[in-house]
Each structure stands twice: as structure tokens, then as C-alpha cells.
């Protein structure tokens, strides 16, 4: 496993830890790193829709703000990937 992937796995663990303490968060599904070094967070809401939001840093504040800030909704994870998959450098389904 290369250094970038190892570092990103630490970021995924950090997201998981923060996610558990957030209000109104759905079930965390995936964490992405885009080619532009922005993090994509995919969760599944109560209605079963996949929600994609973007943050530039990983912190409780940025993730909570993302939840209240109009994430894109999709019927399936495959739909999320077909729309945004081309810009993903690394992705981990959790």
C-alpha cells in the first residue's frame, strides 16, 4: 500500500470517529478524496437515499456544516459514482 493510501486510511478512521458524534448524520457509506484534494462524504439517509457532500478539511465543524448544507441526493451508490466517479483519486467504502 502506498503512502498516500495509508495516510488516507487514517483520514477515513478520523471521519468515522467524528461521524458517530454528529447530529442528524445518516449511515456513513464512503469517504473519497478528489483529484482536487477535497473530501467527498457519502452517507445513506433515513429514506435510503445516498447523500454526497464535500469538505476541504476533516473536522467536527466542517462535517456538521456539510450535513446542513445541501448535499446532493442519489437513488443508489452507483448513481453517485456515475456522476462523480471520474474525479475521485481514492475512495473507501466503509
UniProtKB/Swiss-Prot annotation:
It comes from the Viruses. This is Putative gene 47 protein. It comes from Bacillus phage SP01 (Bacteriophage SP01).
